Amino acid sequence: VYKRQHFGYTQNDDRGYIVKVGDKAPDITITYTDGTRKKLSDFRGKIVMLQFTASWCGVCRKEMPFIEKDIWLKHKNNPHFALIGIDLKENREQTIQFGKDLKITYPLTLDPEGKAFYSFAAQGAGVTRNIIIDKQGKIVFMTRLYDPEEFGKMCEVIDRLLD
């Protein structure tokens, strides 16, 4: 159930999230495959899409080509946008191979212990999730699994925030 609310949608969410739309996003540490580390707060002033994924997740594998085509290729050169794939509980080599297998060009980062994931989702919650964060660091939209209608709404939210 979605209700329009200024830039995003409010969502009644019982899908395993421990955060909600309107919350300040937890300031997680993001570790790139080259070892570079950043805090989520380093991206303040940008629209950020966090994409939680894993190579063993069939739904993730189905969704990621759409993220590549409909979001990343459209916005990758926009200095006000960041897309960060976060690979749950896999090592560097697995993460790099996962990106190659799916021909993903957006950054896939490491979350070997699930610290980033469990800052947003409950223990035992499923992995296919996207979180859109506004320039002030607030959560404005969240998805669970891959639903084409919800994915389309997420694309609209990103487009509006970048207008």
Task: Label every model-predicted segment.
Residues K100-T105, D111-D159:
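Thiol/disulfide oxidoreductase modules built on the thioredoxin-like
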Residues F7-L40:
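N-terminal "domain-start" segment that seeds a small globular fold
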Residues R61-L102, P112-S119:
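Structural microenvironment flanking redox-active thiols in thiol-disulfide oxidoreductases
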Residues T33, F43, K135:
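Short, ordered coil/turn segments that flank beta-strands lining enzyme active or ligand-binding pockets
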Residues L50, I84-I86, I131:
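Conserved hydrophobic packing residues within short motifs/helices of P-loop NTPase cores
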Residues I47-V48, F81, T128:
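Alpha/beta-hydrolase fold active-site loops
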